[in-house]
From Swiss-Prot:
Coiled coil: none
Protein name in the entry: Large ribosomal subunit protein uL4
UniProt xrefs under InterPro entries: Ribosomal_uL4 (IPR002136), Ribosomal_uL4-like (IPR013005), Ribosomal_uL4_dom_sf (IPR023574)
Segments for region (Disordered): 57-78
Record's signal peptide: none
Keyword RNA-binding: yes
Family the entry assigns: Belongs to the universal ribosomal protein uL4 family.
GO cellular component terms listed in the entry, alphabetical order: ribonucleoprotein complex; ribosome
Assembly and binders: Part of the 50S ribosomal subunit.
Gene: rplD
NCBIfam families registered for this protein in UniProt: rplD_bact
GO molecular function: rRNA binding; structural constituent of ribosome
Amino acid sequence: MATVKVYDQNKQESGEVTLASDVFEIEVRPEILNLVARAQMAAKRAGTHNVKTRAFVSGGGAKPWKQKGTGRARAGSNRSPIWRGGAITFGPSPRDYTFKVNSKVRSLALKMALSSRLAAESLMVVKGIVLPEAKTKHFAKVADTLGLTKALIVAPEENADLTRSARNIPGLTLTTVDRLSVLEILKHKQLVLLEGAVESVQARFEKKGA
């Protein structure tokens, strides 16, 4: 089991916490991280793109000119894909981009993402963040003190004041343990766990038996 230092919001050491080796110290397999990250990105796609093919574009029923005798190239419809204002060939149509990934693989990928941040020494445990006011400037000051530039901050549960204070700071994302995802971890260079989140993350896997 790994032991990491716990810091307060002023970046002063305030203790240590032990991280479960079966959650934070497993072998990282890039192909599994890639699979789950792609699945999560695909799930975000609306898939509402659409174009009009020959079947849907209006007009074009009449032959523009007779087949022979005009000197022009033959044409059967003014809605042909090669005409201006015509239909689209092989364009996109609405579709569902999601694909299934087994729950055990998703769970394994999340452990790998957490392990990758610990191995890269870019995981920090912070005792807690208490702001005098729910203002962006106060959160920005704490982030600057902790040296956070592109960081995912994980709270054990929803905190409206922290959410409101952090949402406009570029590069910082505040989330909760139940919304923690592989994609979000990989998108950020730093991972910050508020102290209560460590136990919640480990309990999340215990409940699943993963």
